């Protein structure tokens, strides 16, 4: 999560846009003796907060992103504390939520983006680091490094030494990568969501090729392009969709970076994933949006304006709760990322100090 978003700006952005997207109806959790269920119709989910459990020797340190491999293993990255270099930043769990392994100490203090990609018969992790790290890397699923790269100086966007002497410096000429989208040709897009507000394009070897976008509010311009995804849902030509977070919208582009359309009315859309016809958009302001094949809202999971007020109260005090005091079952605080697994279940990573990973088990 971007350290420089002020509390005042966060509160103002959220308060003025919470009602902008048409909401089918406010959803409340349905609780029985065995299940806590949210959603409606064909999109109902059992809520399993704190589903994966860490061994006692580890602690969540502000969870950021989640990804699932083809075997059903869940990968979680947290930001981590810069002064705890011996603590891993990436954690792996099996389909029952049991701990499998951990690695990635090198991302402590700046762990952010995380995606799994299949390349031929192999799978790899793609990771981004922000803050003082300012890097992005390709790893095996066991955490072995394949390559690591820094600011693309060929872009002409960044000052001297941004790639060789990274520091915790913010600004539109800084390199602060957030998330990936994988291209059909083996290349990928990399969103510089906290830095230059550009979307960089790389080839399959990780060589910089081009970029699109710039800071601003117009079509093709961004204000915190935090998430990026290849939208190849059935019946449509593949495009790249960007979660333009502080502009409160999604923007679609051709794979060459030409603007196609804009969908306004979100609060703080943080990232994107898809499953069949559904687009999944975790929103940093206490809800998760599902869009249908026509890009119209199916539902906002966890939507509750009164709860949102509580989440934002006293400078987002609930975010810092050390034991979950004040948190409500079936509600979210700050969904920073979410992803589907092949069965249509959803995993949610929240931007809270103690970290929280929730499994939404699909029941309909």
Language-model regions: role of each:
Residues 30-364:
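Eukaryotic scaffold repeat domains enriched in small/polar residues
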Residues 1-17:
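N-terminal secretory signal peptides and thylakoid transit peptides that target proteins
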